[in-house]
C-alpha cells in the first residue's frame, strides 16, 4: 500500500501559517520517553508552524489494522519495529512535517541516523516522577509497563522499569539536535518547539 499525506487518516492538517515566510523544507521529529508529551504538543506545534502533524505510532496501527498492544501480542516486537522503520523512511517524501516518534524508535542506529539526516530531532525530556505520574494517570495500554498477562505493573515496579529504560535510552535521546524541557505546561513546550524550529528555518 502506497503511503501519502493526503490519504492517511493518521495525519492531522494544520490551518495556520507563519505570516511572513515558509521555512525551507524541514521535517521535525519529536522523540522522548512514553508520556513525555510528543503526541500532545506535536499537533499544537504543527498548527503554529503551519505544517501537517503525523503520529508514527498511529500510522503503524493504521497500516497494521490493529492496536500496538495487539500487534506486539500477535506478531511480536520485531514486526512492530519493521513497520516503524519502513514508515519512518516514508516521511522523507514530505517536506515541512512534524512527526511524533515512538519512544523506542531512535534506539535503532539506522533510524536515529535517518531522522538526524532528514530532519530536526527534538528530545522532549521529563523526569521520572513526571513520566510516572502521567502514565499512571491514564488508561492507555502500554505493553512495556505490563506483565506477561497484559496486566499493568504495580506503581513501584513501573517506576523501576521506567528508570531502567530511561538509563538505556538516554544516549539515543540525547543524540537529538536539541533537548527541550517537557516538564512544563503544554503551551510553554509548544512555544519552545516553535522558537527552535523557526530559528533553524530562518535564513542566516
UniProtKB/Swiss-Prot annotation:
Its EC number is 2.7.1.71. Mg(2+) binds at residue 39. It catalyses: shikimate + ATP = 3-phosphoshikimate + ADP + H(+). Signal peptide: none annotated. Pathway: Metabolic intermediate biosynthesis; chorismate biosynthesis; chorismate from D-erythrose 4-phosphate and phosphoenolpyruvate: step 5/7. ATP binds at residues 35-40, 142. One of its GO terms (molecular function) is shikimate kinase activity. Keywords: Amino-acid biosynthesis, Aromatic amino acid biosynthesis, ATP-binding, Cytoplasm, Kinase, Magnesium, Metal-binding, Nucleotide-binding, Transferase. Its main location: cytoplasm. Monomer. Substrate binds at residues 57, 81, 103, 169. Catalyzes the specific phosphorylation of the 3-hydroxyl group of shikimic acid using ATP as a cosubstrate. It is found in: Cytoplasm. InterPro entries: P-loop_NTPase, Shikimate/glucono_kinase, Shikimate_kinase/TSH1, Shikimate_kinase_CS. This is Shikimate kinase. Its cofactor is Mg(2+). It comes from the Bacteria. Belongs to the shikimate kinase family.
